């Protein structure tokens, strides 16, 4: 009905804290019980495939939850994490994987393969790849050669076992070759999120129309680098939480003024080269920020202005 080709699921591995949205895992081989049994997850993916919809899953190869019933100090010692807290603790308060250990690399490679093999996901989006390219994502600390090698080996291995699977990097750096094949010196991903496009376009449409003539570069700058990689354009979950406001609410002006601007922004996105990704709720003009503890405000579809916006987004998807 809405003409989507794929669904991307936020992490489905078991995790203790709802507020982590699944990005702080304890069970890398265990689907979370929040949504049912493993067999029910397989059935969901199968029914999506029967409807012509692919399913992509978020995978977290950077860090894991600090809960002691997970991987932390698994046998009383630091098996999976760094013993040095200065490098072992992530910015989210979780434990960084120690990728220099072969056993840790094999564990993560096996986990990624498990989701593709057992549940027939059509792709994996790897979270926080910038934290693997540079030491804890800090370019000033230099490239992390060990984790780059880990990414190359994992991507090559997954492609050899699942040639049609999409491998997507969430990466905010300018590191070259993220989407080039490994045998050509790249990291072996198929696509990379274009976070710069998202931030630039949102800033443009947040500004008052009378000042936008000085900000045209925010619409055009992406074409300066676009063909260096294979990009995926996204308006994602990170932009509709923690006081940032929803996509619709970011638009300049009063309530009624926001809709035509959001329509223009999405039309520009659809006309721009690259794959498209849109977080749930954006398609009908969600007004409240996303909160993992409640569902989206579907009642907004009873309002003509939101229904018309949803129909417009549906038409754009059909055109795409």
Task: Describe each model-derived feature in a short phrase.
Residues 120-122, 134-295, 300, 308, ...:
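Conserved alpha/beta catalytic core and glycan-binding cleft of carbohydrate-active enzymes
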Residues 1-121, 125-143:
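Substrate-binding/active-site clefts of carbohydrate-active enzymes
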Residues 97-98, 102-105, 301-311:
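A short, structured beta-strand-centered segment in the mid-to-C-terminal lobe
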Residues 76-78, 91-93, 225, 290, ...:
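Bulky hydrophobic/aromatic packing residues
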